[in-house]
Amino acid sequence: MSTSIVGPLAEAKPRTERPKAYKVILLNDDYTPREFVVAVLRAIFRMTTDQAHGVMLTAHLRGLCVVAVYSREIAETKATQAVDMAACEGYPLLFTTEPED
């Protein structure tokens, strides 16, 4: 009679899902100077001057522009930092976040 020894089954690794992506959206306003918007985009979102200028113009012409896509926590943090930076200078610049489709 033979006896076979069976080792433990391999542990199943839990599947980790990618965090849901969130868009940071710049909303146009008629009060914040364009140069300041570019400065905020460069400082908070680490854009080049050309990239920031393009985003600013798109928001100006269309009313809004997606700035970047991040995980929820990072998107909300960056949007808050940008709004706070504008508020410190007395500008009503707004950034919002929403889930990416």
Stretch-by-stretch model annotation:
Residues M1-D101:
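Terminal domain-initiation and capping elements
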